């Protein structure tokens, strides 16, 4: 272990030596750039672009380009990047993460690699965690970029598609991570290429990269639509039932935060809902409602996991930032269960149309980099998941902050009493204090304590994040006391007021350890920026969440030996601090393993999504007749059906093929059994394909011009693809839940998921081709003078096909259809999974 650490440290030192040499080469251009007039300096941008077009690489241009930005920043912003900022900029250009402490000027550091990469003309995305930072950074740094001749766009959720398209077309685009993700998904749902807003994803520079790529890695971005459902009553019934339970009726596993009914709970459920067996196959839907009601009532906690807004909406609280996540909803019915629990209106369930996780979104960029003050603890995950390194950058000035040993109290009451005393003492002498909490509930509790003690203070949490920047900016003033949920206000510097340095600078007090060391380090890092004095102190108790869930028995044994009572003094021990960090490492390891497993599942979806989106993009952008593609679909559909029935007895086989042809390919009266008798399977395929092409050509002939033909083909294909893909996403979600249980049978759930999802994907492709074939052949297309609108085309196709979608021809003899043959109704499903089970 010691050797591994030594190797890592030596590698970091070697990397820093290289970066210093490169930074010195940039600095060597300083006098040359300073001697240029404003116009000459601005002209460098066009010169660099031309040199890039002539074959020079961005690496070749790096030293001069960085020097130009440095000089430009001095003239426009009055800021001159330090050597350490140049080093950070080089790391960013190389597609890695420079770990730069709070207050070291990460925003200015980013200007150099952003400018350099924008010269390629393929777009640079500067990604922030919220729209306040998006607008702030774009406005402040945009002044420099515009002065140097580059265009800057701001992408906000409220902007129209046209405004978004304009923002993405700029050399540099500022946006939040979520908006880039949603725009990507929406772009892959449009019917016309001109409605897309994004260019291909080129280079992303992510601010607070650990927050987005680690903390929110598992968060799926979901575009969904409402599902017609009458399930509100079930949510309320399940909620009423769960609220009637005693503690003995359910079992909670604290570490994993899972819950289920005990035997007595199952008995009560069967009595309450008048069932013989709760876990009968017919009651699967009901058990899902009960499970969600259990989670909502006994796992999800008000003011910690979510808050109720003034508009009576359930808003999710981000566990890592303490902010409410506007527009986000828990999936799979959990959000509705919480709404029923809190007595607010239960909103309709939705169906997922498209989804992607941040892990897979950002891995799509040609080059990815990011900035943060705390990434080294997650170095392995950055390397394994995103193939990017973490390089610690030295501070411009030595860190003067004093980090005190943790203080441990036996109970929450005694801990908070000590916190209030500490805050009061520091407030009286004028030292500003920032108190960090992990939940809204803790903020409110501590705020009441401070009010009772007569200490004026500000509270920053999920309930008032709109004042976030203002509260944080004032947190360094003399006598200021600020309570901040977790890392609220991250991205805004706390500058010390007059006379505060002499009082010891900003004191940061943590009211408990977070499950991630990185989050604790972020809180500490709010103090002691740019060599300022400061202090940090963590107060812990045995009743803290981390200690309850993961505290080791050794800690408890030590405390028993000390025989602490609530009134007695606190423990301060290096051994204890090490034990807490060991618990944190265990949690971090668990979380990393979870994210890794999520990625394994999501990679399956990613591969399938990329295939569907690529095919979809080809259809959208094709400015040609799509007949060759449609002909191929028709041929494969015919081949698939004939092959699927090839082993059936001859009479049954011909009957099935005849019904298939009549109701999916050609007019009923145009084909009979005699047309198929005496033909081999290959001859039948050729015969049906020839007939189908005749029908296809007659359908297309009804459309007066080429534009109408292309429009009809595109809309028809996209409608089918989108419907099938939406159903497939739902099916994959259900599969993922199902394969988890197979682990009990010694099967690897991920391998099972990969295998099963591959089969389902192939089935979906077959189903898409079947539906395109059937719609193309059976849609009623009236001769027309001009192209019909997308809406009319789709409506006609839907209206004329929907009646046949699941209706069985009256003269079908079901007894003659084989279980594994395709159902003659034309659904594309096997008979045993369709009309064969009715």
From Swiss-Prot:
SUPFAM superfamilies from the UniProt entry: Helical scaffold and wing domains of SecA, P-loop containing nucleoside triphosphate hydrolases, Pre-protein crosslinking domain of SecA
Cofactor: Zn(2+)
InterPro entries: Helicase_ATP-bd, Helicase_C-like, P-loop_NTPase, SEC_C_motif, SecA, SecA_CS, SecA_DEAD, SecA_motor_DEAD
Comment on bound cofactor: May bind 1 zinc ion per subunit.
EC number: 7.4.2.8
Name listed for the protein in its UniProt record: Protein translocase subunit SecA 1
Purpose: Part of the Sec protein translocase complex. Interacts with the SecYEG preprotein conducting channel. Has a central role in coupling the hydrolysis of ATP to the transfer of proteins into and across the cell membrane, serving as an ATP-driven molecular motor driving the stepwise translocation of polypeptide chains across the membrane.
A single cellular component GO annotation: cell envelope Sec protein transport complex
CDD domains, sorted: DEXDc_SecA, SF2_C_secA
Family: Belongs to the SecA family.
Deletion phenotype: Essential.
Sample GO molecular function, one term: ATP binding
Catalytic activity from the UniProt record: ATP + H2O + cellular proteinSide 1 = ADP + phosphate + cellular proteinSide 2
Alphabetical keyword list: ATP-binding, Cell membrane, Cytoplasm, Membrane, Metal-binding, Nucleotide-binding, Protein transport, Translocase, Translocation, Transport, Zinc
Enzyme superclass (EC): translocase
Chain sites annotated for binding ATP: 85, 103-107, 493
GO term, biological process aspect, one: protein transport by the Sec complex
Subunit (UniProt): Monomer and homodimer. Part of the essential Sec protein translocation apparatus which comprises SecA, SecYEG and auxiliary proteins SecDF. Other proteins may also be involved.
Compartment(s) of residence: Cell membrane; Cytoplasm
Source organism, top-level taxon: Bacteria
UniProt keyword annotation of Ribosomal protein present: no
Bilayer disposition of the protein: Peripheral membrane protein
Major localization listed first in the record, in broad terms: membrane
Residues where Zn(2+) binds: 823, 825, 834-835
Pfam families according to UniProt: P-loop_SecA, SEC-C, SecA_DEAD, SecA_PP_bind, SecA_SW
């Amino acid at each position: 272990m010691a050797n591994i650490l030594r190797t890592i440290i030596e590698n970091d030192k070697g990397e820093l030596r290289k970066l210093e040499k490169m930074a010195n080469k940039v600095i060597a251009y300083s006098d040359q750039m300073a001697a240029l007039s404003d116009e000459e300096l601005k002209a460098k941008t066009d010169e660099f672009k031309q040199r890039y077009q002539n074959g020079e690489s961005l690496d070749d241009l790096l030293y001069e380009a960085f020097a130009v930005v440095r000089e430009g920043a001095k003239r426009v912003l009055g800021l001159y990047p330090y050597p350490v900022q140049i080093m950070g900029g080089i790391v960013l250009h190389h597609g890695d993460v420079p770990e730069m402490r709070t207050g070291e000027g990460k925003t200015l550091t980013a200007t150099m690699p952003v400018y350099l990469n924008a010269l390629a003309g393929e777009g640079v995305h500067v990604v922030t965690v919220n729209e306040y930072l998006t607008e702030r950074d774009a406005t402040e740094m945009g002044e420099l970029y515009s002065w140097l001749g580059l265009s800057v766009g701001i992408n906000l959720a409220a902007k129209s598609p046209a405004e978004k398209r304009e923002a993405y077309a700029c050399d540099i685009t500022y946006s939040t991570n979520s908006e880039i993700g949603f725009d990507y998904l929406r772009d892959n749902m449009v019917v016309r290429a001109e409605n897309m807003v994004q260019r291909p994803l080129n280079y992303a520079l992510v601010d607070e990269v650990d927050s987005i790529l680690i903390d929110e890695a598992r968060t799926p971005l979901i575009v969904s639509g409402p599902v017609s459902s009458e399930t509100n009553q079930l949510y309320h019934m399940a909620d009423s039932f769960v609220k009637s339970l005693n503690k003995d009726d359910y079992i909670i596993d604290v570490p994993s935060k899972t819950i289920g009914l005990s035997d007595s709970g199952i008995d009560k459920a069967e009595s309450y809902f008048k069932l013989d067996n709760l876990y009968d196959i017919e009651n699967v839907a009901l058990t899902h409602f009960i499970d969600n009601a259990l989670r909502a009532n006994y796992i999800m906690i008000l003011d910690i996991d979510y808050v109720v807004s003034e508009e009576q909406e359930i808003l999710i609280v981000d566990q890592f930032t303490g902010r409410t996540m506007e527009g986000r909803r828990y999936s799979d019915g959990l959000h509705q269960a919480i709404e029923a629990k809190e007595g607010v209106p239960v909103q309709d369930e939705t169906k997922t149309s498209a989804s992607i996780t941040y892990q897979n979104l950002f891995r799509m960029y040609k080059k990815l980099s990011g900035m943060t003050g705390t990434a080294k603890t997650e170095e392995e995950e950055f390397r394994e998941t995103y193939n990017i390194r973490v390089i610690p950058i030295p501070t411009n000035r030595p860190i003067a902050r004093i980090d005190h040993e943790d203080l441990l109290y036996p109970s929450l009451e005694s801990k908070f009493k000590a916190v209030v005393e500490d805050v009061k003492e520091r407030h009286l002498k004028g030292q500003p204090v920032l108190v960090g909490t992990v939940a809204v509930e803790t903020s409110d509790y501590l705020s009441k304590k401070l009010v009772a003690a007569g200490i004026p203070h500000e509270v920053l949490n999920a309930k008032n994040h709109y004042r976030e920047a203002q509260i944080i900016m004032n947190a360094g003033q003399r006598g200021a006391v600020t309570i901040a949920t977790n890392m609220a206000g991250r991205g805004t510097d706390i500058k010390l007021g007059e006379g505060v340095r002499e009082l010891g600078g900003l004191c940061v007090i943590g009211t408990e350890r977070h499950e991630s060391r990185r989050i604790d380090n972020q809180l500490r890092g709010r103090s002691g920026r740019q060599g300022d004095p400061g202090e940090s102190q963590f107060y812990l108790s045995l009743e803290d969440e981390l200690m309850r869930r993961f505290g080791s028995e050794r800690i408890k044994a030590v405390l028993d030996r000390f025989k602490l009572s609530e009134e007695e003094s606190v423990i301060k021990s290096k051994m204890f601090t090490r034990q807490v960090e060991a618990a944190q490492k265990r949690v971090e390891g668990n979380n990393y393993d979870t994210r890794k497993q999520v990625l394994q599942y999501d990679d399956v979806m990613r591969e399938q999504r990329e295939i569907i989106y690529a095919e979809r993009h080809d259809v959208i952008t094709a400015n040609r007749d799509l007949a060759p593609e449609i002909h191929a679909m028709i041929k494969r559909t015919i081949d698939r059906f004939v092959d699927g029935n090839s082993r059936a007895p001859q009479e049954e086989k011909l009957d099935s093929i005849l019904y298939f042809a009549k109701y999916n390919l050609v007019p009923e009266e145009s084909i009979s059994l005699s047309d198929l008798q005496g033909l081999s399977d290959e001859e039948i395929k050729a015969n049906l394909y020839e007939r189908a092409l005749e029908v296809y050509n007659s359908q297309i002939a009804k459309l007066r011009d080429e534009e109408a033909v292309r429009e009809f083909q595109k809309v028809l294909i996209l409608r089918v693809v989108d419907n099938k893909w939406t159903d497939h996403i739902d099916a994959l979600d259900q599969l993922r839940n199902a394969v988890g249980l197979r682990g009990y049978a010694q099967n690897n759930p991920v391998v099972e998921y990969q295998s099963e999802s591959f089969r389902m994907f192939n089935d979906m492709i077959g189903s898409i081709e079947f539906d395109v074939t059937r719609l193309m052949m059976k849609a009623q297309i009236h001769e027309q003078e001009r192209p019909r609108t997308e809406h009319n085309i789709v409506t006609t196709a839907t209206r004329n096909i929907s009646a046949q979608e699941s209706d069985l021809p009256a003269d079908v003899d079901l007894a003659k259809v084989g279980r594994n043959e395709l159902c003659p109704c034309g659904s594309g499903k096997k008979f045993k999974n369709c009309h064969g089970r009715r």
